[in-house]
Amino acid sequence: MLVMASPNHLVIVCGHGIWLGGPRHGHDEAEWLIESYKAGETPTFVEHIRAGLQVLADDEQAVIAFSGGPTRKETPLSEGRSYANLAAANGYFGLLQSGEDESGTVASQLHPRILVEEQALDSYYNILFSLVAFWRAHAVWPARMTIVSHAFKQSRLVDGHCGPDAIAFLPRTRIGFVGINPPNLPAEFGGTAPADDKKAVMQGAHDVLDHWAVDPHGVGSLLAGKRRGRNPWAIDQRLFAHEDERRRSGLQTRFVGGDMEALTEDGLRPWNEGPASD
């Protein structure tokens, strides 16, 4: 039986694709469902998973959230669930003790230090839904957070999404970041290859950063519209299942367009107020 220390550290691994399963345990790109421009990037996704598990292994009070909704019409499998499946299929890369039942066989349930977040449709909500999932599972808000994603997204994720105008997980010193870039990035993004086929996508990353700067909660028509376009399975975009849960969380939210829930601009951020009981 696994005994978990009282958790206070949330590790978030942001999903970028969907592992469909297979005998190579994610080490064959044919097992993945990804956009064409992400060709060659699936080894990086595996490294994100491994890196998140390493942070988890180094801190007995950490809990990891694999985050991402079912963004593809071809399968209802979510990014977050597929990442958790891949981690388990690879024996957690030897970094975590595997759960075993009384017969000594590997237990089928999720590892107790792993959360699967299956609603997020963009990077802002990777963080926000994961924070709520941590509170829901452990009845406290995390004191620290580590985000694992592409290195070139650090400014957007940490300074933007977690900054004072958005999620406001403060101060900045409470946030760690593990950045691992995919291959063949243009030189201005830390790569060494010309990667002409990726330049348009990377220019889009610049544009997205600008969009978030003027709409830090992603509630405007452009960013909210992108989320709707990534939601072929009509996954619920509310942060809380019911009003009582919302009240107990201490989080102040608003509804956007009738189908999404967002933080209020200047509302209480309970993760900055010390332990919050469920």
Give the positions of each predicted feature.
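Protein-protein interaction regions
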Residues: 7, 11, 20, 163-178
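Short, flexible loop segments at boundaries between secondary-structure elements
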Residues: 168-204
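A short acidic (Asp/Glu
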Residues: 75-79, 125-129, 156-162
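N-terminal beta-strand-loop-alpha-helix module at the start
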Residues: 1-122, 233-278
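C-terminal capping/extension of enzyme domains
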Residues: 189-260
